Amino acid sequence: FHILEVRAKETLTRAGEPGRWIDYSIDSLRADFLEVFAAIEKNSKGRYRIIYNLARQQPADYYVDFVVESADNRSVAMPLFFKDVMRDLIANARKYTAPGGTINVGVYETEAELRFVVQDTGRGIPPDEIQTVVHYGRRGSNVQQVRTMGGGYGLTKAFLVTKRFGGRFWIKSEPGIGTRITIIVPRPTGPRVG
């Protein structure tokens, strides 16, 4: 239930200040996402594991590489909504990648911008659908039969949040190879918020 408490607190905070950026220590951000990965694995009811050491990967395991860095090597500032975006895109990567696949996640903050990349070895998105897959409720035609608990809004939310903060959003994907989503958001000027 700890993860639900954290999400509820984040939601209430965002309601009052939707444009606010907040500083997260790199260690706490990593810990938060290790909890997210643990919850995803637990929800599988033993169908797969999420592992972080490639040498331990078995055929039913997802290998996850999750790296967070910043110019100061201590903290990363991001919009309050951005952790949700990260969670959604990571969940999509897992959902559309078969067990045995790889999910790479990178976060890097410079003085000028926040960069986020998630890349998987999943199904990919048909090339003629990349422009429209960010529309509300849309999924690629090659995943219509995949049973999901979501409504197809993760990419939409990621795209809209990125645009809301003046950022840039790219999808590079190839069916049968995987997908790479890159988001770059300019940092606001002024002091960092803790």
Regions found by a protein language model. Give the residues of each.
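Short helix-loop "hinge" at the ATP-lid/N-box region of the Bergerat-fold HATPase_c
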Residues: A93-R94
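Short beta-strand/loop element within the Bergerat-fold HATPase_c
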Residues: G100-A112
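Acidic ATP/Mg2+-coordinating residue in the GHKL
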Residues: D120
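Short conserved segment of the HATPase_c
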Residues: I125-R138
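Hydrophobic Leu site in an alpha-helix of the histidine kinase catalytic ATPase core
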Residues: G151-L155
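Glycine-rich ATP-binding loops of the HATPase_c
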Residues: G166-K172
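Glycine-rich GHKL/ HATPase_c ATP-binding element in histidine kinases
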Residues: I177-I181
